[in-house]
Structure formats: C-alpha cells, structure tokens
Amino acid sequence: TRISYAYDIRIFFQFLLEQNPAFRDWSIDAFTVDVLDQITAVDLEEYEEYLKVYQAGDKTETNGERGLKRKMSSLRSFYAYYFKREMIHTNPTVLVDVPKIHQKSIIRLEADEVALLLDYIEHGGDDLTGQKKVYYEKNKDRDLALVTLLLGTGVRVSECVGLDIEDVDFKNNGIKVTRKGGNEMVVYFGPEVEKALKNYLEVRKNIIPVEGHEHALFYSTQRKRIGVQAVENLVKKYARQVTTTKKITPHKLRSTYGTALYQETGDIYLVADVLGHKDVNTTKKHYAALDDSRRRQAATAVKLRED
C-alpha cells in the first residue's frame, strides 16, 4: 500500500540521518531529490544491514527476509521513478541485490501423528473429572468433526468457520465452500469425515443458537458461529499433546492434507485444484521438496542392466 511504501522510504532517510556522517546535522525535511545522487551502492548495503535490527524511538525493530525484501524493493522503486524522469543521474539500487526469500520447509503432521491427534481428541478426556470432564464432553464431537474436516479436505480455517449447515451434502459427500475471491466450490470428503460430521450433527440438534446464527455449521460455546481464533486455539491445544517440536495450526493441517494428497497421487494440478490455489506455481513452490524426493526415487527406478 502507499502508506507502507511511504513508511519504508522514511526509514531510509532516518537511516541517513542516524548513520551517515554526511547527513548527521540535517533534519528529515531538508532532503531534496539531488541527495539521491550522493548515495552509493555501499551506502545501500549498509542500509540493508541496518534494517536487520534498528531503533525506532523506544522500540527495537527487526526485519526478516520478507521485511528486508519489501523495504529494499520500495527503495528500488523510489529511485527508478526519479531516474526514469531524469531527475537524478545515478541509480545505485540496481547494483545491490534484492534479498532472496528462502522457502521454509513445510511443517506438517506425519501419518502416525494424525492418528494420535484424532485419538486424543476422541479419548483424551477419558481420565478427566469434574468440570474439566464436563467441558471436554460438551465440545468433543464438535472438535473432532472440525479437526477431521480440516485434515480430510484441506479447507482453509476461514472457509471452515464460514460453512452453513446447508452447505453439507451427505448424498454426494461434499461441502460447498467459498474460496478466496468469493468463488464457490464443492470439496469432497471421505467416510471418516462423514462419520465425524454426522456424530457432531446429532449433538448440534440439541443446541439452541443465538438469533442470527441458526445456519452456522459449527457453534462456539456461546452458541454463535465459531470464529477463526477459537479454531486456532483448539487446534493448538490438542496438537500440543501430540507434538512439542512442531507449532501446529489449522493451516498446518491444510499442509498435512496437501502433502498426503500429493504423495498419494503425484498430481500437483489436482492438489492445486483441491486446495483452491489459483496459480499452480504456488502449489509447486510449497511442495518442491516433495518433488525432489520423487526425482531421487526416479533415479533408481529404471535399471539399465538386469542383475
């Protein structure tokens, strides 16, 4: 946005005031376009280093790869504007590489962890007593249906909480979701999701919803449509009992589904379609490591000589 862009450029001039001896006695409103011609590629490299950790008033600001890339890209656009209009004679930003963003490996649950997670939601409260037991039993079927649906379809958490009861079609075992951009799509589910949903719907019949929330598929404990944050919290709560080394969120359950589907089918276009990615390159980028694994398998799949 324009505000973010202006903020990024202001940080650059703040850096010049604080770190560059040539501008130490200046004020920020003293800068004119000609100053840009005095800046060198070395200055910009120092600015990039500065951005990693710097003081902004009483706060310490930090930038990771994405933050660095955005701020350096903003500066490059700023210079390009004046250079193209011949208001400056040099453009040192083209001599400095824009920071690369390294893809993080996909965090997902392994097959045994998926089974443990669902088992824990289903039976984790068996040893509880008192009020904790009551609370667990009250939400168990809903939570199991929610997590099973996320794991079994790969829908986004926003799509999940937006579901109405009318969106569920047991005749064809599909749910109608509204994707990013407002497009509607039917996502199909298997027997495990069907069973979990039907069990929850039996419990749901006994809930009297708050007015205006009658159509919501999943209710909160306040008898309203459950929110994204509530689902985030319950997924994290259960996942902590299964793994302490992975930070599992609803989005990681989506990654778990996408990974399982790709490993099962090897069809990146199918995965992209089911996950609702408009651009298959988005899917390829996320599952590149899995592609590498398949390519390694291909290396030994063809024998040149029989043993």
Where do the PLM segments sit?
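Conserved catalytic core of the tyrosine transesterase superfamily
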Residues: 1-307
